[in-house]
């Protein structure tokens, strides 16, 4: 791993939070269901490059992403997984004390408060057929920073699933966590984004095997398994990238209005990006179209009528791993809330992730 990568690790954490902050706009834009209205307000501010985030707060997404990162940091090198899971549970529970004005999701709030990290298996919660939301996906990217090596794929699968189902014990929820982490690892390894979707489809059977052998609510998980897989397959076919080689095909026109409609179509309940399958999907769609343009990424993933801060948090992280801070106006992140913590997390995860350490299973 080269010297430039440490800056990209830092950018991954910082720009994830910048995306969150911009997409959230102190709650004003996350819950505004009209992308065209958001883009008009954005234009009145002088567009993305004119925004100074000094008075803008991060949402629950960044608070929970930091919780994941800081648990991974505390676990150190070569942790055993049950110990790591207890630390994740502790950080998720404790971060609920910093949710005032950050619009935390119901499943995250309710379930994190019930985690009991001091008890054996106190990080487990029962299966719930209503926990397919994006709360697991929005906080898992840094797992891919910590375990980026192909030899660590099994660990990445296990940690992303178990961290996800601490609040979202439903495949649509925790497989979103897997997608967020896996695509981050792909970005670290310089894998072309058009290959990522195919990679996810190849990893899903391994995820299913893990959930089956973990022996916890297996029947219920398998009954609800197919939705995530089918939705992703449908999306990859639509963009023409199921083969992992072809260039993605976008409809014309595909402006703000058309994207809003598309995000509704891929959603579970009509709010694009609010579930575990479509939050990473919308982030991925934006990344494929944006190339190295932070502004184009923002216009597609941060500013739309769906769950914009969650798609922004995920997309900002992946883009940061790939491009660092290249072409990003410093006003978008210089006065970011918790910037120091985010930078420290990026550096610490680089230090841990650059060693191909062995992880001890349960």
From Swiss-Prot:
Gene Ontology CC: one annotated term: extracellular space
Binding, Mg(2+) 1: 59-61, 309
EC primary class: hydrolase
Binding site for substrate: 90, 129, 135
Chain's role: Specifically acts as an arginine mono-ADP-ribosylhydrolase by mediating the removal of mono-ADP-ribose attached to arginine residues on proteins.
Family: Belongs to the ADP-ribosylglycohydrolase family.
Protein's name according to its UniProt entry: ADP-ribosylhydrolase ARH1
